[in-house]
Amino acid sequence: MTISPPEREAKKVKIVVDRDPVETSFEKWAKPGHFSRTLSKGPTTTTWIWNLHADAHDFDAQTTDLEEISRKVFSAHFGQLGIIFIWLSGMYFHGARFSNYEAWLSDPTHIKPSAQVVWPIVGQEILNGDVGGGFQGIQITSGFFQLWRASGITTELQLYSTAIGGLVMAAAMFFAGWFHFHKSAPKLEWFQNVESMLNHHLSGLLGLGSLAWAGHQIHVSLPINKLLDAGVDPHEIPLPHELILNPSLMAQLYPSFKQGLAPFFTLNWSEYSDFLTFQGGLNPVTGGLWLTDTAHHHLAIAVLFIVAGHMYRTNWGIGHSMKEILDAHKGPFTGEGHKGLYEILTTSWHAQLAINLALFGSLSIIVAHHQYSMPPYPYLATDYATQLSLFTHHNWIGGFCIVGAAAHAAIFMIRDYDPTNNYNNLLDRVIRHRDAIISHLNWVCIFLGFHSFGLYIHNDTMSALGRPADMFSDTAIQLQPVFAQWIQKTHFLAPGFTAPNALASTSPSWGGDVVAVGGKVAMMPISLGTSDFLVHHVHAFTIHVTVLILLKGVLYARSSRLIPDKANLGFRFPCDGPGRGGTCQVSAWDHVFLGLFWMYNAISVVIFHFSWKMQSDVWGTVNASGISHITGGNFAQSANTINGWLRDFLWAQSSQVIQSYGSSLSAYGLIFLGAHFVWAFSLMFLFSGRGYWQELIESIVWAHNKLKVAPAIQPRALSITQGRAVGVAHYLLGGIATTWSFFLARIIAVG
């Protein structure tokens, strides 16, 4: 930490906003493309509408003034938050108006969650399945019911109130977006004041946010959930305001409330251990994490982040300076180290966004893996359809964010990177030895690809030849994942040494006893074997190839041996001009395009592995004779051949979606069919040449001219880049919707 010289102390509070910078007017709304000289002239060819969509939000292309760009982005964020609040409000409104939440609350193990009722217009009411408790509706798999129970919501009135609150917040956000662009817009120096931003985001957003949630959990969620777990009728449970205002009510449930704040100020904190616990594992009644553990966790997180938000130097001459930290960060082999990175991160929002997307995407994938192993909400673990949906959803989101990180890193390299300010720092050194990085990464991909695929091919061949003893499997040649098993064992044993008062390890997946709720497995030890070893190497392969493509796109965004002046051609271009063959599809955009396909591959293998593994080895029913898993443990025997994946996973488990017609799951059958069609439609764009379509269009235009109905706007074939964009969008949409309908029809039918 450094202390500032006294002359910096005298800094007075500065005005960091401009008043009324942009007048509010709807004139521009009537003029599509007002932000571009070319587009505002209106359409002459059909390419205009594509360029309009491509450039509407490309603020860099509309102005070079960083302050104006920053204000537009800042204002757009408020608009985004407004839309999120409207969406959330809609979810809560559906819970209040169209759901069986109160019935589900009374019997969450037998009644399924539903918050949508289909109106009978032409027979769609077949979709309203019987979810139990005398309610007909569509089974939802978003996890909102479990979240609401964990929050302590017991009545539909509370859901209505929260829905209205969401709309009020949305209005506030839309107002803020308008106000901070038109009335009081921050100056560039406000956006670049990173120390203030860190302090406010760490202390305010994360610190006080966690503290507020911990307070809600302690005063509202814990008492209500304790009573619900004990079987008290939701209608007889005191309302939140009664619990907050009446300490004697709380003291009946948590005796330490009698003592008030005395133990806190006398540092006798262990008195509060009746509602701030460190038990570990899952609550056997609900199959979720102990809510007293999660309240304790949020309180601890709040303390950490409130402290963290006091670390950076602002108007008082104490604390860290981000620039000083980065400039001082040098190692013996890293040249100038982090010098120059501060300037990059305060002048390039693409660089900032790239880092945030990479972190946020990784975090989303981490959430996916924790929400099944450590289910945070009551009765989440036994709702298999919701578990599968949340896992799948958070993986897809993470994959898209990580590809987006590479996209914006490449845009930064092209639009914002200045080689003169980055001599011999880490970024420059990485770019200078990019050939070594990419060629080594390429070797790793080849190694992983041939070896992982080769193990499967070997097994398929031996299986076809009737030689099971020569296969890699748990019953023949074993390839046990010994490191993963060691990690499981150490995590199972660790709490005994590091947290002797904890009742269990962090998750039953490490080892120990089965946690069953209402005769269903919530979580249990997950045994790993040869089949997991094989598919984990496919995970490694697909992830490394995705990284290879994306990283190559970033490192070669400005120049390459093939096209030394690539930076001048921009982020997306079809080829390096006429007369230079073999230079097509090399733009940074094309790397993002290819990266999306490999991201789709990678995530697909992950969610397929999860879906089959859980059905085979975890999910199922518990009775006196033991555990009966949904697919009876067939993962270990079948998942070690490609044929096994095709026959015993894809084919065997698609019968529910294929045979869903005439049942309440029939929508999934239609989506399955339609999404296959959307996916196939994408191939028409991906496998075709632009000239083919231009020829066809000209012949059709000729026919229109003959009939004197020629259009005023001249039709044009999609450009190569546009065609590829339309192709990849439909490929991903079709693929994801196919997987979604396949998973849900299956798991709702058998789960």
Curated annotation (Swiss-Prot):
Sites where the protein binds chlorophyll a: M684, Y692
Any Pfam family hit: PsaA_PsaB
Note on how the cofactor is bound: P700 is a chlorophyll a/chlorophyll a' dimer, A0 is one or more chlorophyll a, A1 is one or both phylloquinones and FX is a shared 4Fe-4S iron-sulfur center.
Organism: Tupiella akineta (Green alga)
Encoding gene, per UniProt annotation: psaA
Protein name: Photosystem I P700 chlorophyll a apoprotein A1
Annotated positions binding [4Fe-4S] cluster: C575, C584
Family statement drawn from the similarity comment of this UniProt entry: Belongs to the PsaA/PsaB family.
Description of how the protein assembles with itself and partners: The PsaA/B heterodimer binds the P700 chlorophyll special pair and subsequent electron acceptors. PSI consists of a core antenna complex that captures photons, and an electron transfer chain that converts photonic excitation into a charge separation. The eukaryotic PSI reaction center is composed of at least 11 subunits.
Binding site for phylloquinone: W693
General function of this protein: PsaA and PsaB bind P700, the primary electron donor of photosystem I (PSI), as well as the electron acceptors A0, A1 and FX. PSI is a plastocyanin/cytochrome c6-ferredoxin oxidoreductase, converting photonic excitation into a charge separation, which transfers an electron from the donor P700 chlorophyll pair to the spectroscopically characterized acceptors A0, A1, FX, FA and FB in turn. Oxidized P700 is reduced on the lumenal side of the thylakoid membrane by plastocyanin or cytochrome c6.
MF terms in GO: 4 iron, 4 sulfur cluster binding; chlorophyll binding; electron transfer activity; magnesium ion binding; oxidoreductase activity
Topology term for the membrane: Multi-pass membrane protein
GO terms under cellular component: chloroplast thylakoid membrane; photosystem I
Binding, chlorophyll a': H676
Record key words, sorted: 4Fe-4S, Chlorophyll, Chloroplast, Chromophore, Electron transport, Iron, Iron-sulfur, Magnesium, Membrane, Metal-binding, Oxidoreductase, Photosynthesis, Photosystem I, Plastid, Thylakoid, Transmembrane, Transmembrane helix, Transport
Organism superkingdom: Eukaryota
Gene3D superfamilies listed in its UniProt record: Photosystem I PsaA/PsaB
Subcellular location per the Swiss-Prot or TrEMBL entry: Plastid, Chloroplast thylakoid membrane
GO BP annotation list: photosynthesis
Catalyses which reaction(s): reduced [plastocyanin] + hnu + oxidized [2Fe-2S]-[ferredoxin] = oxidized [plastocyanin] + reduced [2Fe-2S]-[ferredoxin]
EC number: 1.97.1.12
Keyword Amino-acid biosynthesis annotated: no
Spans through the membrane: 73-96, 159-182, 198-222, 294-312, 349-372, 388-414, 436-458, 533-551, 591-612, 665-687, 725-745
